[in-house]
A protein has these predicted regions:
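Conserved GNAT-fold acetyl-CoA-binding loop/helix
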Residues: 21-41
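Short loop/turn motifs at secondary-structure junctions and domain boundaries
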Residues: 42-48
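Acyl-donor (CoA/ACP) binding surface of acyl/acetyltransferases
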Residues: 1-21, 25, 51-147
Length: 147
């Protein structure tokens, strides 16, 4: 189930991202508490962001959201590692794309994160390319949902 992000969720999101295994899988740096809170304050203040908390049986299991970057709506999500493999990402993404009608939606995933690539494909995203920023060791798979 998706719901609006509540202030108490931010501390839970911090715990989720403070996991080196999950951080490596997502190719996203672990932030200290101050940087994490500042990051979420910026997210929630940005009117282009549509952020949701992912809840299962009353427990926060992750978050999903989209934002506008370079004129394109990009989507991202995070599932706490202890909840991986239970279908939360697929259900959340399916619900999210049903809620957010704007198309196309874009996603970038570290190429080693095959689980996330599968989730996006199940929800209709197609691989449209690959990218690697200068100096960044992580190659990304670029996906798009058109309909």
């Amino acid at each position: 189930m998706l719901r609006t992000v509540e202030p108490d969720d931010i501390a839970i999101f911090f715990e989720h991202q403070d996991d080196p295994v999950a951080s490596e899988m997502a190719a996203f740096p672990v932030r200290d508490r101050a940087a994490h809170d500042q990051h979420w304050a910026k997210i929630l203040a940005d009117e282009s962001v549509i952020a949701r908390t992912i809840v299962d049986d009353g427990q926060v299991v992750g978050n999903i959201g989209s934002f506008v970057a370079d004129g394109e709506r990009a989507i991202g999500y995070w599932i706490a590692r202890q909840h991986w493999g239970r279908g939360h990402a697929t259900r959340a993404l399916a619900d999210y794309v049903a809620e957010v009608p704007e198309r196309p939606l874009h996603a970038r995933v570290a190429e080693h994160n095959v689980g996330s690539i599968r989730v996006l494909a199940k929800c209709g995203f197609a691989i449209v390319g690959e990218d690697q920023s200068d100096g960044d060791p992580v190659r990304e798979i670029v996906l798009r949902l058109d309909a």
